[in-house]
Swiss-Prot record:
Heterodimer of CALCR and RAMP1, RAMP2 or RAMP3; the receptor complexes function as AMYR1, AMYR2 and AMYR3 receptors, respectively, and respond to amylin/IAPP, calcitonin/CT and CGRP1 ligands. Interacts with GPRASP2. This is Calcitonin receptor. Keywords: Cell membrane, Disulfide bond, G-protein coupled receptor, Glycoprotein, Membrane, Receptor, Signal, Transducer, Transmembrane, Transmembrane helix. Glycans are attached at residues 28, 73, 125, 130. Sensitive to cholera toxin. GO terms for biological process: adenylate cyclase-activating G protein-coupled receptor signaling pathway; amylin receptor 1 signaling pathway; amylin receptor 2 signaling pathway; amylin receptor 3 signaling pathway; amylin receptor signaling pathway; calcitonin family receptor signaling pathway; calcitonin gene-related peptide receptor signaling pathway; cell surface receptor signaling pathway. PROSITE patterns: G_PROTEIN_RECEP_F2_1, G_PROTEIN_RECEP_F2_2, G_PROTEIN_RECEP_F2_3, G_PROTEIN_RECEP_F2_4. The chain crosses the membrane at residues 147-169, 182-202, 220-242, 260-280, 297-320, 341-359, 368-394. The lineage of its organism: Eukaryota, Metazoa, Chordata, Craniata, Vertebrata.
Length: 474
């Protein structure tokens, strides 16, 4: 049961953690499954038959051996194809991916002895290829799988907790309301829903081997909603990138943008690839609970997601270019200018989600690969926590608004219960309660005396960052 539990964790991790699992580096990294699903048996057998057909075709097409001295004849050993090999040579290939517990990054060896005969195992005197390394590191991978499994649960739980608090702050404090905060709230909601679905999947589906074997429609529906929310997550990131790019680069500082197009892109468009994927998956690759990543049909969803990330990457580059240009115009010291640029970039990176574009390939080295796994899993599973921290808890306007509300609450509490605060604390509380002390960071608040026909609308964001100055109309 331990092997079954962990193997499904690993299969799910491949599906959840990478924008596209068909990249070359990802295809060379599979994890052990001791109790594979029947559908995957069919897939593995088909791969083996295709490899056998290609091997016999290759053996017929290759010319005769041109070397001197004894050699071992080309052969199919049942799993892999071996070319003519000179005597005394140890040949090797990467492990096949027919079996879920085989690691294709490891190597298979086959020895041709000095007489030109393939090595035979002493126990049965039959030709033998050494496949022992293909699953030699299973215990180490199991231990690593458990760590990554619980890291995912902790990360998504912490993300839900912090995002709910952040969302509550943005909803409760109406003074923070503006178009950019509206985009924040929608993106926060996608993070919350996606993390909830992932936790349900990890807790209820992954360790439940009987449920996966029964393959109910409910687990596929859960998978559908996970894929949909994952796509919504990245497309709301794209909405944030488009909005920031419009404000900073296009410089539409004084006009309110039409948010309905953002709603259509963030919530509506992901339904298209997700629905197409579900239909084609049910017809062409209907594996149990749709846990397998051994299908190119995932490109239907991951292709648009990767496109959104690439677009956001170029948005980030252009935004940073504009920010650096603006900061140069302020004639500040060079070191301070680049410090601001780095700070602005580090704030925008988790928002635009470009870590998959900057570091999309897993290193083949074991140690570097393990470091990569932990770094990428931390970025992925704790991304909601990072976003909530950067865009809510560390935001100056949010901090000032919360402090002002807390100061007002303390004044009301003291007045109600008859406790008289000291003159120093009273002056500090009164100063914190001043509405004009709110720094411009999230959005530039318009004047309070708005026209009557604009009442109830959200104020447009005029200046998204302190370092951006409104250009004079010319």
């Amino acid at each position: 049961m331990r092997f079954t539990f962990t193997s499904r964790c690993l299969a799910l991790f491949l599906l959840l953690n990478h924008p596209t699992p068909i990249l070359p580096a990802f295809s060379n990294q599979t994890y052990p499954t001791i109790e594979p699903k029947p559908f995957l048996y069919v897939v593995g057998r088909k791969k083996m038959m295709d490899a056998q057909y290609k091997c016999y075709d290759r053996m017929q097409q290759l010319p005769a051996y041109q070397g001197e001295g004894p050699y071992c004849n080309r052969t199919w050993d049942g799993w892999l194809c071996w070319d003519d090999t000179p005597a005394g040579v140890l040949s090797y290939q990467f492990c096949p991916d027919y079996f879920p517990d085989f690691d294709p990054s490891e190597k298979v060896t086959k020895y041709c002895d000095e007489k030109g005969v393939w090595f035979k195992h002493p126990e049965n005197n039959r030709t033998w290829s050494n496949y022992t390394m293909c699953n030699a590191f299973t215990p180490e991978k199991l231990k690593n799988a458990y760590v990554l499994y619980y890291l995912a649960i902790v990360g998504h739980s912490l993300s839900i907790f912090t995002l709910v608090i952040s969302l509550g702050i943005f909803v409760f404090f109406r003074s923070l309301g503006c178009q950019r905060v509206t985009l924040h709230k929608n993106m926060f909601l996608t993070y919350i829903l996606n993390s909830m679905i992932i936790i349900i999947h990890l807790v209820e589906v992954v360790p439940n081997g009987e449920l996966v074997r029964r393959d109910p429609v409910s687990c596929k529906i859960l998978h559908f909603f996970h894929q949909y929310m994952m796509a919504c997550n990245y497309f709301w990131m794209l909405c944030e990138g488009i909005y920031l790019h419009t404000l900073i680069v296009v410089a539409v500082f004084t006009e309110k943008q039409r948010l309905r197009w953002y709603y259509l892109l963030g919530w509506g468009f992901p339904l298209v690839p997700t629905t197409i994927h579900a239909i084609t998956r049910a017809v062409y690759f209907n594996d149990n609970c749709w846990l397998s990543v051994e299908t190119h049909l995932l490109y239907i969803i991951h292709g648009p997601v990767m496109a959104a990330l690439v677009v956001n990457f170029f948005f980030l580059l252009n935004i940073v270019r504009v920010l650096v240009t603006k900061m140069r115009e302020t004639h500040e010291a060079e070191s301070h200018m680049y410090l601001k640029a780095v700070k602005a970039t580090m704030i925008l990176v988790p928002l635009l989600g470009i870590q998959f574009v900057v570091f999309p390939w897993r290193p083949s080295n074991k140690m570097l690969g393990k470091i990569y796994d932990y770094v990428m899993h931390s970025l992925i599973h704790f991304q909601g926590f990072f976003v909530a921290t950067i865009y809510c808890f560390c935001n100056n306007e949010v901090q000032t608004t919360v402090k002002r509300q807390w100061a007002q609450f303390k004044i009301q509490w003291n007045q109600r219960w008859g406790r008289r605060p000291s003159n120093r604390s009273a002056r500090a509380a009164a100063a914190a309660a001043e509405a004009g002390d709110i720094p411009i960071y999230i959005c530039h608040q318009e004047l309070r005396n708005e026209p009557a026909n604009n009442q109830g609308e959200e104020s447009a964001e005029i200046i998204p960052l302190n370092i951006i100055e409104q250009e004079s109309s010319a």
